[in-house]
From Swiss-Prot:
Name of the coding gene: atpF2
Protein name as annotated: ATP synthase subunit b 2
Location in or out of the cell: Cell inner membrane
A GO MF label: proton-transporting ATP synthase activity, rotational mechanism
Superkingdom of the organism of origin: Bacteria
GO CC terms in record: plasma membrane; proton-transporting ATP synthase complex
Membrane topology: Single-pass membrane protein
Length: 180
């Protein structure tokens, strides 16, 4: 029976320890605190020696890349401003040259036009003078023909009316009538 009592006492002792959660048992707290501190120190060293330097290196590289990109962008902006300035200067120069060429071409065309106009005016004046001379000849010929026709007609009328025609009197009468 003694063994039964001893077993019952041992079971009762173990039963007291099994009650509740072992994490809340004050008998294990010093051991749990020790392992908590060891774990925290291990995490601290892992973070400070491995993870944080890598993160810091990535951040530094990113900062460097951003700084380099900003510097490159500023440099490209300066180049773009210079290129735009050179483009505007070249454009202005090209416009000035084009305007000079246009003015030169206009002057050449105007000179050719003036020359052609002067030549045409000279031809027209020559033809006009020639035409006026021909008209004057035709007029003179026509007046002479009219005078002869008038003399012949007057002599024929005088003869038809039964009179004798005097050539000098007919000439004088026709000349007086032709003058006005």
């Amino acid at each position: 029976m003694e063994t039964e009592v001893h077993e019952a006492a041992g079971a009762a002792g173990h039963a007291g320890q099994a009650v509740g959660m072992p994490q809340l048992n004050f008998d294990y707290w010093p051991n749990q605190i020790f392992w908590l501190l060891v774990t925290l120190v291990a995490i601290y060293f892992l973070l400070t020696r491995v993870a944080l330097p890598r993160i810091g290196a990535v951040l530094a590289e990113r900062r460097g890349t951003i700084t380099n990109d900003l510097a490159a962008a500023e440099e490209l902006k300066q180049k773009a401003v210079l290129a735009e300035k050179a483009y505007n200067e070249a454009l202005a120069k090209a416009r000035a040259e084009a305007q000079a060429i246009v003015a030169e071409t206009r002057a050449a065309i105007q000179a050719e036009l003036d020359e052609a106009t002067a030549k045409a005016d000279a031809e027209i004046s020559a033809k006009s003078a020639e035409s006026e001379a021909r008209i004057a000849e035709i007029r003179a010929g026509a007046l002479q023909s009219v005078s002869e026709v008038a003399k012949d007609t007057a002599e024929a009328l005088v003869a038809a009316l039964g009179g004798k025609s005097d050539a000098a009197a007919v000439d004088a009468a026709v000349a007086a009538r032709m003058k006005g």
